[in-house]
């Protein structure tokens, strides 16, 4: 077959030789490398136990505590209680008690719902038990860097169910450039090692959900493919439906067979900053000053906004740009508080994987003890608060401070201790280094 025979094309997809990487010839037919890959994928999917008859694929190696719970039965007595879930969250996330309680109760009820479904499937449920437990999806509202995503990531470490995180900013309505909403389920399926039954009892966290608000309160004549269109596409998934999930994402491989996933028992947690939502609430509540005293005087702007959001009503979210049908499918709303200076101080030192502990461990591997003076921690928290990006600013500041230290110390065998001072934070000066006595030059004898 000549490399330059432009009339040759794939007998399956019709693409010419110039459009594919490889064209394989057969007796009077040709097949391209893309169609070969597609055939392999279809054969691999036949191995999935979609109907309970085929063999399961070999699971990935996982830590013992995770492997123990995969595909295992759920006993009501083994379900973690809300207090236990919150206690674990307290070890990793500072503050946000209301959001922790909402998540703890929601996850606990999610487990109970799965236990009831399992008892009905095994015939252990009472014959007259006709009550069906419906899920209550969650909406987390709060400024950037206050712990919404960290709460979701921390939950993923303790759950006995698959947990996936998705970003709403990449989603578009079907038929337009971007990701389909079914790709969210694909992430959950991948976390569950392509185990469909396991994925159908999982939890999905959708971040930046406020970015799909429609551009105006009134329905637009033109299509809003990344806003209202995405909200419409998410409705059935949030409520519960049989979704067709393409194993490779759909857009680049349109001819693949889809995997069907029932979303009825998948719990959805949505989070977003919703910048400007407090102004919508203010307009509805109609806060007015009497005399010269302003409401919330003496509070920071962020604290006033958080207090205002305590009076949030569904109509406020509609005015912000969320459609009523979407709001009805996320009935539980929790407001995440902004982080003040004291909270940022606590984040530096108190959590199990606190930032200071991380850098202390890094330097300990070089046999150097790292210390932060209290006034240095205060200066770091103050600078992070001024940056207005929440806890995310802390890592950037500490990374700037420790760059030169972490560059030099691996080559310095004479240093035993490094101390970060307030002056170092404010002026970006050099850290205080303590030299091992044996490395000091010995005084000359007379």
UniProtKB/Swiss-Prot annotation:
Q: Which organism is it from?
A: Nostoc punctiforme (strain ATCC 29133 / PCC 73102)
Q: Does the keyword Mitochondrion apply?
A: no
Its assembly, as annotated, is: Component of the ClpX-ClpP complex. Forms a hexameric ring that, in the presence of ATP, binds to fourteen ClpP subunits assembled into a disk-like structure with a central cavity, resembling the structure of eukaryotic proteasomes.
**What is this protein's gene name?**
clpX
Could you tell me the Gene Ontology terms of the biological process aspect for this record? cell division; proteolysis involved in protein catabolic process
The alphabetical list of record keywords is: ATP-binding, Chaperone, Metal-binding, Nucleotide-binding, Zinc
- Residue intervals of the ClpX-type ZB domain: 1-51
* UniProt-annotated binding residues for Zn(2+): 10, 13, 32, 35
The entry sums up its family as follows:
Belongs to the ClpX chaperone family.
One Pfam annotation reads: zf-C4_ClpX
> Cytoplasm as a keyword?
no
Intrachain disulfide bonds: none
Among NCBIfam families, the record links this protein to: clpX, PRK05342.1
Q: Which domain of life is it from?
A: Bacteria
* Gene3D superfamilies the record matches: 1.10.8.60, ClpX chaperone, C4-type zinc finger domain, P-loop containing nucleotide triphosphate hydrolases
- Region entry Disordered: which residue ranges? 54-76
**A Gene Ontology molecular function term of the record:** ATP binding
Function description: ATP-dependent specificity component of the Clp protease. It directs the protease to specific substrates. Can perform chaperone functions in the absence of ClpP.
* Residues involved in ATP binding: 143-150
According to UniProt, the name of this protein is ATP-dependent Clp protease ATP-binding subunit ClpX
Q: Name one GO cellular component term.
A: HslUV protease complex
